[in-house]
Amino acid sequence: MLNTLIVGASGYAGAELTAYLNRHPHMNITGLAVSAQSADAGKLLSDLHPQLKGILDLPLQPLVDVAQAAKGIDVVFLATAHEVSHDLAPQFLAAGCVVFDLSGAFRVRDAAFYSQYYGFEHQHPDWLDKAVYGLAEWQSEDIKQAQLIAVPGCYPTASQLALKPLVDGQLLNDAQWPVINAVSGVSGAGRKASMGNSFCEVSLQPYGLFTHRHQPEIVTHLGTPVIFTPHLGNFARGILATITCRLKAGVTAQNIADAYHHAYQNKPLVRLYQQGVPALKAVVGLPFCDIGFSVQGEHLIIVATEDNLLKGAAAQAVQCMNIRFGFPETQSLL
């Protein structure tokens, strides 16, 4: 059994993560923590998330002393704000813990990226170099050796899973950048109340045009430029990405299907549509990314869907943990 501490368990992704780990046969949850200043400190997780009543009636402890909290801990999950993960991860790593960070604090190795897109100066370039990007279907060998796994963002997960087989297979025409239009549910903004996320205010609206931090994350790890436009949708959870591309001359629909099949035939958490494209309702509450496409001449449209809290966060973190420790990849997820 691996002793596990979850920091930031009070949030949406943190609660989903805790539920997955609670039913994992090789994980022992030794504590749930929140920041010392959190208004949730001292409350039961099940008081904040009533669906967990009778399942996870565990207290949320204020994290005051990291060295003390790390004693006897094998694995730490950080479902915390970017700046918080930036500060906490090196301390847990120094204590010998394996850390899975769901924030963006270690996803990109260029330290200048963080001051530009996250608003803080990165102080741990050594861990930026050592961190492994946890796109589970593509980084499994590196994940097996890593001490710090940076779990990808929600939009980058769907976007890269949809595009990477085609980019790596050199099937796309470089003269036209892939265009990613993606819509996310409101849970992607977290539990903290705000006017823009309130029931009567939420509509369907693009945001972060040319400035969203997930665009350079996608470009860095995909290895090709893209145009990315996120949208906030008036639903609770899920992401649907519609991606338009231009194919190289002579590339057929069968070539696209073959590339996806080759990439994901042994990847149980990516589901490929032989016909048609996926709908959001088929993935909400499940750990999958579903992918479908349509071709007309040299034009390709891909649709990828996922639950932003699961494959876009908690489920992928557990998937990475399973890979890291040699457990079945879907353990506790299916």
From Swiss-Prot:
CDD domains assigned: AGPR_1_C, AGPR_1_N
GO molecular function, one term: NADP+ binding
Keywords: Amino-acid biosynthesis, Arginine biosynthesis, Cytoplasm, NADP, Oxidoreductase
A single cellular component GO annotation: cytoplasm
Gene3D superfamilies in alphabetical order: Dihydrodipicolinate Reductase, domain 2 (3.30.360.10), NAD(P)-binding Rossmann-like Domain (3.40.50.720)
Record localization: Cytoplasm
S-S bonds: none
Enzyme class, first EC level, given as a word: oxidoreductase
Active-site residue list: C154
Catalytic function, reaction form: N-acetyl-L-glutamate 5-semialdehyde + phosphate + NADP(+) = N-acetyl-L-glutamyl 5-phosphate + NADPH + H(+)
Enzyme Commission no: 1.2.1.38
InterPro entries for the chain: AGPR_AS, AGPR_type-1, NAD(P)-bd_dom_sf, NAGSA_dehydrogenase, Semialdehyde_DH_NAD-bd
Pathway: Amino-acid biosynthesis; L-arginine biosynthesis; N(2)-acetyl-L-ornithine from L-glutamate: step 3/4
Gene Ontology terms: biological process: L-arginine biosynthetic process
TM region positions: none
Family: Belongs to the NAGSA dehydrogenase family. Type 1 subfamily.
Family matches, as PANTHER family: N-ACETYL-GAMMA-GLUTAMYL-PHOSPHATE REDUCTASE, CHLOROPLASTIC-RELATED, N-ACETYL-GAMMA-GLUTAMYL-PHOSPHATE REDUCTASE, CHLOROPLASTIC-RELATED-RELATED
Biological function: Catalyzes the NADPH-dependent reduction of N-acetyl-5-glutamyl phosphate to yield N-acetyl-L-glutamate 5-semialdehyde.
Name of the molecule in the record: N-acetyl-gamma-glutamyl-phosphate reductase
The organism's taxonomic lineage, starting at the top: Bacteria, Pseudomonadati, Pseudomonadota, Gammaproteobacteria, Enterobacterales
Gene that this polypeptide is encoded by: argC
